[in-house]
């Protein structure tokens, strides 16, 4: 599959197409909200077919991605408008999903403000100097649009290429970013994070407020450049019980989501958050992402009225025999139909050993093929 070569000079977009001007009012594509199944489902409508996309659809599951990324560090690929554009488009060509998701990483805005973070293969983000006190907090300056010029450039290039396919922007939620910063990397128990949360609540809330500002600024660049929806990833929120989530986390996620109320649909997703679904919806999401542990009809009941749901096929179901996989896909769709709106997805990201052809088959099954 050919690589898209993007001329990143001012006034030029992929394939010589001039990108649309910056600014949210000009970037929204006329009529898309009324016709795109993904956006209609986010608004709690029931389009003719269930829309589908896959978390981590742009990434290492695709051989063309691995070829493009050969010799290129993850963070470097996230800071190059040409690579962002090509990687975002690769799964759109492969699977014909109902939405594309902007290729990036949740630590990109933290690196952009000067933090020393590396993404280590097989581990994940590793923070050179963990943030555990007021001195560390002081190092977290505000994110400015000029810190991430490649983001707006890539969004504009993508809008010129995607046609009627909506583009989802994304960012990491304050709690998940805080956990990486406090722990110094991924953690099984989030012990340091919870210790700071319980023992120094003033510092904790100051840290999450700062991260909420950074996340909001990162999403603002994407929304103003023209993304059609956004997803707030709170990967580690499932480490908390509901009371702690509501007290220490939800207000900060709510502030991020509130910044985009009425502009674009807002999706809120976390892993192992079955007991937090109502609180995550109340934080201001239009769509609540659900992992595979809770059936979607039960998830919709927990979340309550006024929300669509997204999910939630077990990512390992793609390794099942086809009749088993097809039955599971149909079950997810049937349960999702009980919600006010349903966007089909996996219950977490695509596993790297997944056969891309199976994902294409899942998309066909969801669409009624």
Swiss-Prot record:
EC code(s) of this entry: 4.1.1.37
Pfam families named among the record's database cross-references: URO-D
Gene Ontology BP annotations: protoporphyrinogen IX biosynthetic process
Binding, substrate: 56-60, 105, 180, 235, 348
Protease keyword on record: no
An MF annotation (GO) of this entry: uroporphyrinogen decarboxylase activity
Protein name: Uroporphyrinogen decarboxylase
Organism: Frankia casuarinae (strain DSM 45818 / CECT 9043 / HFP020203 / CcI3)
Lineage summary: Bacteria, Bacillati, Actinomycetota, Actinomycetes, Frankiales
